[in-house]
Amino acid sequence: MLRRDLIKSTIATGLATAFPGRAAASGMTAPGPASASDISNDRSFWLEQMHRVAHPVLSALSQRRLRTTMPVEKSREGAGNRGLTTHLEAFARTLAGIAPWLENGGLEHGPATANERELRTGYLEIVRQAIAAGVDPKSPDYLQFGATSQTLVDAGFFSLAVLRAPQQLNAKLDSTVRAQLADALRATRPLQAHANNWLLFAAGIEAALFALGQPWERTRVDYALREHMQWYVGDGAYGDGPHFHWDYYNSFVIQPFLLAILESVGNQEEAWKAMIPAVNARASRYAHILERLIAPDGSYPVIGRSIPYRGGAFQLLADVALRHALPEDIAPEQVRCALSAVLHRTLEPPGTFDKAGWLQIGLAGHQPNLGEGYISTGSLYLCSTAFLPLGLPPEDRFWSAQDASWSAQKLWRGDDMISDHAIDI
C-alpha cells in the first residue's frame, strides 16, 4: 500500500508541476469547453489530457480493482456480455495509445522535461503492475482472454501496444509476466476473425508473439496482409473487407495495424517485405486526407460507425506524425495544432467524463445514442491513440516549432494553396 501511495503521489506531483494551473486534471474533473483564444497546443496540455483519460484505468487495474470500480455503460441494444470484456477493451486501448510515450517520452535532459520524466516513471510502475494483474489467471482482474470474440479485438490492441514499446512493454517485463502475457494472447487463437479488419487483430497477436520470442503462426499474418492488399480501393484507402465503408476504420484499425505488423515481421517473408513501400505510401496519403478533414474549429465529419471513439479517428495521422512520415506539404506543427483542436472538441465538453473520471459514450459530451451495440465504456478508450506523438521528444519539431494553421484553417481564411490530388499506388 505504501508503494502504491508513493506512485500516486509521484504522478500527482509531476502533473501539478508540469502544468501549473491545471492541477485539477489530476482529480479527474472535466473543465468547461475552451474558447478559441484559450486553446493550447503545447505538450503539457496533451499530457494533462492523456492523464485524465488513462489514469483511472491504469490505477484501478494496478490495484486489481478495475472490475469493481469501472462502470459499464452501453447502449440499450448492447450485448449482454460487455461486462465480461469491457475491462480488457479499456486497458488494451489505453495502452496502445500511450505506449510510445512510455517507451520514449520525456527522456531528454533538462529542467523542461524533468517533471515529465518523473511522471513517466510513475506511469511505468503502475502500467507494469496493471499488466501483471491483467494477465495473471488467478487475479480478480484477469482480463478474460479468449472468453468471447471481442477479446480477439482487444488482445490485438494489447499486441499493438507491445509492438509500439518493445523495451518497456516487452523486454523489461518480469519473465513470469511475459510468459503469462504470451499465454493470454494464445488463448484467443480459437476465436474466429471476421473477413474484415478483424484479420489484422489475429495477425497483430502473432506479430506480438514473435516480438516476445514465442512460436508464432505465419499463416495468420500472411492471410491478413494478402487480403488487405486485395481490399485496397485506391487513393490511400482500404475496404473493410471486400467493400469500402465511409467511416474511420482505416484509422481506427486498418492502417495502424498494417504499419506495426510490417514493421515487426515484414522482413520475415519476401512477399511481405515487398508490400512495405506501398503500405507506407498509402498511409502517408490517408494521413494527408485526415489532416484535411479537421475543420478550422477542430470538428470533423461525423460519418460511419464507432464515432464515440472520439480522437481515435485520427490515430493514423498521429501514427504517421510519430514516424516522421508526413507528406512534404504537411508540417508537423500544423498536425500538432490540428490534433490539439480535436482533443479540445472531443475531451473538454461537459459530460465527457462521469463524476468519477470515467469516459462516457459520446463525441462532444455524453451522447449515449451514438453507441452501437458493441460499444461500452471500455471501447471508448481508443481515443488514447490520438496521443501517439507524445512518443516524440520535446525537442522534436512536432513539439518545438511555433503554432501553425492546418489546411482547413488556411483555406477557409482565403490562403492560396496547391490543390489536392489522389495517388494511384
Question: What are these regions, as identified by a protein language model?
Answer:
Residues 30-89, 100, 125-130:
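Low-complexity, Ser/Thr/Pro/Gly-enriched N-terminal "stalk/linker" regions
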Residues 99, 120-280, 292-318, 324:
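Aromatic-lined, polymer-binding surfaces characteristic
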Residues 104-127:
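Beta-propeller domains
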